[in-house]
Amino acid sequence: MNKQSLFHIAKRGTLPWYISAAIRGCAILFALIVCALVTMFMTGENPISIYGTIFHGAFGTVRKTWVTFQNLAVLLGISLAVTPAFKMRFWNIGAEGQVLIACLATAACMICLGDKLPNGLLILIMIVAAIAAGALWGFLPAFFKARWNTNETLFTLMMNYIATQLAAYYIIVWEVPKGAGKIGIINQNTNAGWLPQIAGKQYLLTILVVAVLTVLTYIYLKYSKHGYEIAVVGESQRTASYAGIKVERVIIRTMVLSGAMCGLMGLLLTAGTDHTLTTTIVGGRGFTAVMVSWMAKFNPIMMIFTSLLLVVLSRGASEISSVFGLNHSFADILTGIILFFIIGSEFFINYKVSLRKAGKKEA
């Protein structure tokens, strides 16, 4: 006898957006319930207090709220940068390095030219240098992929290590004071190369730039000819070639764009908010951006919400550790559970699971 499984799984058609949103909402609700149970069993703490602390850690004060939105803007900006490549099915895991190399280029301009040029001209040079550095870091793996079909995942990953070691080298070259192993605040006395504050807020410029970038990326991917070519290449390179699209050119152009956008985020990090350079200045957001982009299905508008979710969880994790005296890993456990449910909900959006009816037995 041939035994049939109890469940039948079939591919769904495209669901209306409100049904997809409802499935994701249910996934988050179930995740919070599971997190509450885990919290009670592992710590004995009231889960409501834990969730309240997470919210307070992200929005408890005006300053915390500004920091949350600044972190949201940086993560969203990097996520937007990797999205064109991902939509093309080019697995760019190198955003961390592309942002970091732009931070290095920005810091180099601030340190070497800070006392030699007017501030307006210096900032203009910094913008060009940061975008060019990020674009170069995106161009190299794209060129090798287009010409020799190299593995872009490994290539972009290795470029991260090169960027990290370059940054580490120049941090020692520029360290202040000598032997400190760090640069410190660049041009702290003169503020040369510091991007201007808006309404007295150093975070507001980053937020505004990323807001504009979100709209432009959405229009570019959805309504431009380049966006159409990216979508076609992502579906099938062979089909794209038959349609007269030059696949190699699209690959290189798209990765240069992704790298340039990462470069802009590197400029905003170094010259806009941190005013320094460290090997960890990007803080792993280049890798988190991969998750943000995938969870949002490469939709720049949806990325606002996925970025906000991850930033709130991250900010809340730090607050939990300090308020309850819990190991920071516990907050990571809660974050992992929530992300597991959210990612798992995509299965139920794309597939229908039903009980198989009892049929005739087959010999």
Predicted ranges, named:
Residues R24-M40, L76-V82, C103-C109, A130-L136, ...:
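Hydrophobic core segments of alpha-helical transmembrane domains in multi-pass membrane transport
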Residues V256-C262, G266-G336:
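Transmembrane alpha-helical segments in multi-pass inner-membrane proteins
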Residues G44-S49, F86-L104, A146-F155, E229, ...:
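Short, non-helical or kinked segments that cap or interrupt transmembrane helices
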Residues M1-F30, A36, F41, E235, ...:
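Cytosolic-side transmembrane-helix boundaries in multi-pass membrane proteins
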Residues A199-T276, P300-I301:
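Helix-loop-helix "hairpin" substructures at the membrane interface of multi-pass membrane proteins
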Residues L37-T43, S49, A58-L113, I127, ...:
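Single transmembrane alpha-helix segments in multi-pass membrane proteins
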Residues E152-Y223, F330, K361-A363:
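Transmembrane helix-bundle core of multi-pass membrane transporters
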Residues E152-L154, Y203-V209, I251, G284-R285, ...:
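Loop-to-transmembrane alpha-helix initiation sites
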